[in-house]
Amino acid sequence: MPGSAAARPLRAVKIWLGAIAALIAAMVLVGGATRLTESGLSIVEWKPITGTLPPLTDAQWAQAFEGYKTIPQYRELNAGMSLSEFKTIFWWEWSHRLLGRVIGLAYLLPFLWFIWRGHLGGELKRRLWLIFGLGALQGAVGWWMVASGLSQRVEVAQERLAIHLTLALVIFAAIVWTLRRLDERPVGAVPLRLRITAAALLALTFVQIFFGALVAGLRAGKLYNTWPTIDGALIPSAERLWFQEPWWRNLFDNHLTVQFDHRMLAYALWALAIAHAIDAVRARAGAAARGAVWFAAALTLQAALGIFTLLYEVPIGLALAHQAVAVLVLMLGVLQLERLWPRASASAANLPKSAMAAASRN
């Protein structure tokens, strides 16, 4: 059939994008472990090429350790650390950076091959170039984040950490969306309000992830370890929430405000997800109804993990599970919005004209 002939070149593209999405999800978890083990400042230089190799000799290890000793984190928090202890945190950060390099090559080399083979249409090619540009920007943002903790601070700036994580998941979401748009699937007739609420859910998920990263960067999860109360009340006093000047700094620097915002956003997101699921089921929206239920279920699990992570003062296992399910929730949100979003023919949008013409002659 012409349609299947035209879609054949996209099979390899689908496998490639699926692998990249999986690698980014793994990268987010390794990054989370790097943060939780306080390993992110163990490498004080940014060497995109030569930094691929770790220290191989005793002299190289000693040099790397001496570099770490020059930053405030070592002097104020880890003075007296042994070389073997340094190696533990070094390997986490090195693995995180290596995985970033692997993702870059795993994306760029097949992408160039697909372009050379003429497998990509203009619209798909432009979208993939944009994703590549975001990936390059992410590398720079990663170093910008690390650099914030090398001179005066003992940790990276929490707002830079939040930007770094959010950008990684924007790239992940863009790849998942692009992958789904490669399939030929009709969009059934559903109420416009379902599309609007799905878009609101996805936007709110990104905002919640950003604030979750602020909580992590400030280590605010190790404070106010009660639920549902926080600082002894359901809603803390305005004097405690907004004492910093200018007022907007509280949104980024005030431990209480940041954690309170993260909680309130969670409640709003969960309530909207439940309403969306009920609405989709009542509208007999088919796959969209199932997607809405799955999203609400995953979000409920995520909320429970968040509560237990807080109550137990952020054990690494629970914290990583909380971060992993956040990626799952985001993916389900992307899938739900894409499922409801209008679409053109996948082949027409993603294949080059030459491939479409060849298929039409078959």
UniProtKB/Swiss-Prot annotation:
Report the pathway entry. Answer: Porphyrin-containing compound metabolism; heme A biosynthesis; heme A from heme O: step 1/1
> What are the TM regions of this chain, as residue ranges?
12-32, 102-122, 128-148, 159-179, 198-218, 264-286, 291-311, 314-334
> Which PANTHER family does the entry link to?
CYTOCHROME C OXIDASE ASSEMBLY PROTEIN COX15, CYTOCHROME C OXIDASE ASSEMBLY PROTEIN COX15 HOMOLOG
**The keyword tRNA-binding is annotated on this UniProt entry:** no
Q: Which organism is it from?
A: Rhodopseudomonas palustris (strain BisA53)
User: Whom does it interact with, and what assembly results?
Assistant: Interacts with CtaB.
Key word Protein biosynthesis present in the record? no
Q: What does this protein do?
A: Catalyzes the conversion of heme O to heme A by two successive hydroxylations of the methyl group at C8. The first hydroxylation forms heme I, the second hydroxylation results in an unstable dihydroxymethyl group, which spontaneously dehydrates, resulting in the formyl group of heme A.
What name goes with this protein? Heme A synthase
What does the UniProt keyword field contain? Cell membrane, Heme biosynthesis, Iron, Membrane, Metal-binding, Oxidoreductase, Transmembrane, Transmembrane helix
- Name the catalysed reactions: Fe(II)-heme o + 2 A + H2O = Fe(II)-heme a + 2 AH2
